[in-house]
Amino acid sequence: MTIHLDIPHLGRFGWMRIAGAVPVKLCERLVEVLETEMDVPVHDQSRWHEHGGEPRDLIPIWGHQAQWDIRQHPDLHRIWAVLWKTDRLGVSLDSCRFTPPWKPGFGEPNRIHWDYDPWNAEMRVFQGVVALNETAANQGGFRCVPSLYQERDAWWRSPSLDQDGAKNWLAKNIEGREIVNVAAQAGDLIVWDSRLPHSNSKNISSVPRIAFYVTMGPMDEALRQANVESWRTGRCVPWWRNRRGYDRTEPWTPAALTQLGRRLLGLDDWP
């Protein structure tokens, strides 16, 4: 299957959607795991309030076989290899998100922000999220402000941009700027430049949004060791353990890895 990467769109607007990056059957399998093993009420509307608003819509799952089957899919790696111009990459051990339709009393989505200091040229990375179900533009998915990305060379530090408690950099003054809400089909990958201000949007549809965060990039020794330790012990990487449910008492069984998966984890060296 041919996968199209709109690199010019990524360069101009700071994001791109890659259709069919992951087989739909792998997405369906992970959704099934969320429902049957993680007790996520995918089809039970009476319990959607349990995941109403951040951070309750983040699901503490990071080492399941169904996640690794997506991470180590060759097509997904090829996409990131094109972006980084090298095969020698590591993969993030991120989790899933289940965002039900918003109701009064639910928490608000995160504000538009950067996850990395946008003035630090050495911190530029590509970030990614896989849609596990069809996600309309009003369904709580990825949103961004391309005009701020396009004007990045004119940015300066000012009171309009602060850090929040999670050490994200907030884009406060965005009045009058277009906010783009990105729709996706199951299996699509949305990739964005870390210099693009973004967040999740409010789900004002009638169905949940389900997604899985997957990012690949060059991996230093500290990250490699943390990834391998997480896989071996079944515990999440240290920087997630302060989140609700992430320091679980019953750790994951180490997932079965392909040769590609072992290299992405950092267990084996790249040739």
Task: Mark where each language-model region is.
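Short, conserved beta-strand element in jelly-roll/cupin
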Residues: 119-137, 183, 215-218
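Non-heme Fe(II)-dependent double-stranded beta-helix
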Residues: 2-12, 19-119
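Short catalytic/ligand-binding loop motif for oxyanion handling, primarily in non-cytosolic enzymes
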Residues: 27-28, 138, 153, 199-201, ...
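Non-heme Fe(II)/2-oxoglutarate
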Residues: 40-48, 189, 195-271
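A short beta-loop-beta micro-motif enriched in histidine and acidic residues
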Residues: 113-125, 177-178, 184, 207
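Double-stranded beta-helix
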Residues: 135-199
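Short edge-strand/loop segments of extracellular domains
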Residues: 98, 145-152, 215-221
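Short, structured patches in soluble enzyme cores that scaffold and shape functional sites
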Residues: 95, 114-116, 130-134, 146
